[in-house]
Amino acid sequence: MSKPAADDGYSAYEDSWRMGLLLVLGLLIFQAGALYGMGRTPICTCGYVKLWHGVVNSSENSQHIADWYTFSHIIHGFLFYALVRFLFPRSPIGLRLAFAVLIEGGWELLENSPFIIDRYRAGTISLDYYGDSIINSVSDTLAMVLGFVMARRLPIWVIVSLAILFELGTGYLIRDNLTLNVIMLLHPFEAIKQWQSGI
């Protein structure tokens, strides 16, 4: 005797999440392995791991689990959820999540390439930036996953409000955020760099 259609739908939904999470796990393992092959250190060279590191102009920035830039990666999750929902409206949610992780992981590998590291050091205030530790990079991707899940679960007005709050909050507290980061990476402005240096 076959199960009711509603049960079949719920089962397919669960299977989608399981498949997506397995793909996400595989992508995270690949990301960590690729970063190790690129010479990234597993943890901070200071020898310990902190849950939060809040000093931006520090050699330990982007070396621990979370920092001020974690909020930018959560916003990535908001944006990627909207993107994959637009591009693949009929695809299972698990596959959409895996695609978002693929994009984020690809950016993490690019961000830790010599070209982007040198670009950050030359065009932004990140003079002490020499690349992420592996634990920080993987944590950034998991922050994106958190943002993706939040975007799926919460009303759009909450997501938009949170994105604005994160951008304004980090902009005020550390004079940097996702918007400024993109601007300074693509086309550095000396006025912005000088303003950021005043922190």
From Swiss-Prot:
Quote the HAMAP family the UniProt record gives: UPF0314
Q: Any idea where this protein resides?
A: Cell membrane
The secretion signal range is none
Entry annotated with the keyword Membrane: yes
Q: What is this protein called?
A: UPF0314 protein mll5005
For this UniProt record, give its keywords in alphabetical order, as a comma-separated list.
Cell membrane, Membrane, Transmembrane, Transmembrane helix
Please state the protein's primary subcellular location: membrane
- List the GO terms this entry assigns under cellular component, sorted alphabetically: plasma membrane
Give the family this protein belongs to, as stated in its UniProt record. Answer: Belongs to the UPF0314 family.
Question: How does the record say this protein sits in the membrane?
Answer: Multi-pass membrane protein
Q: Where are the transmembrane segments?
A: 19-39, 68-88, 154-174
